[in-house]
Amino acid sequence: MSLAAKRSRAHNFSLLAVAALLAGAAMVLGSPLVPRAFAGCPDVEVVFARGTDEPPGLGKVGGAFVTALRAQTTRNVGSYAVNYPANDDFLAATDGANDASGHVQHMADHCPNTKLVLGGYSQGAAVIDIVTAAPIAALGFRDPLPADAADHVAAVALFGNPSGRAGNLMTALSPDFGGKILNLCNPGDPICSNGNSWPAHLSYVPGLTNKAAHFVAAKI
């Protein structure tokens, strides 16, 4: 075989090898560009922040809301309890906002088909207000929610929201949620209105948790 023929044969072999490598790379690298849902991702997940002095978990209002939502939909509904102190230091609400925002972003990445529902009661409502209304890091809030992650949130249900005393100002400032947000305030509740009935603040179950579940069920 002549030298020219050998060179031509080697060149053709190199081209075939490169083509095979590129094809393999396309198969390996191409598919992960589209997020894949991990096994076990629920159809819907409620991310809920409990009220002041409630023990860790969803809290009374959050638990009743999740139960009511499950009763109003045939979809698989999971839940996540926002991890934060829920104590008398209201500045710690930013801890909850960081945790809630981080979890929403995690779910958007790992369970892209799951519809997320944000919720909170009393101080927990303030936690979710921060997540939905604060587009930049400030005052201890380190993990603002990117707009693409916000798109995964189907609805927001807030109970006894402290910002209600200011006309739900935080909700009005929310750039990415608009009509997805339902703020519920019992008449006379001193936390979310100018009322003076403490029992009103403690009476969101079952009437208003059922109302919120009906609102959310229509969004998911």
Language-model-derived ranges and their functions:
Residues L22-A25, V127, T209-A213:
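Hydrophobic alpha-helical membrane segments, chiefly transmembrane helices and signal peptide h-regions
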Residues L15-L16, F48-G51, P85-N87, S122-V127, ...:
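A generic short-segment signal for beta-strand/edge and adjacent turn/coil regions
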Residues G40-K115, N186-T209, A213-A218:
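Active-site catalytic motif of lipid deacylating hydrolases and related acyltransferases
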Residues M1-P35:
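Secretory targeting and sorting signals
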Residues N98-G178, L182, I191:
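Serine-dependent carboxylesterase/thioesterase catalytic core
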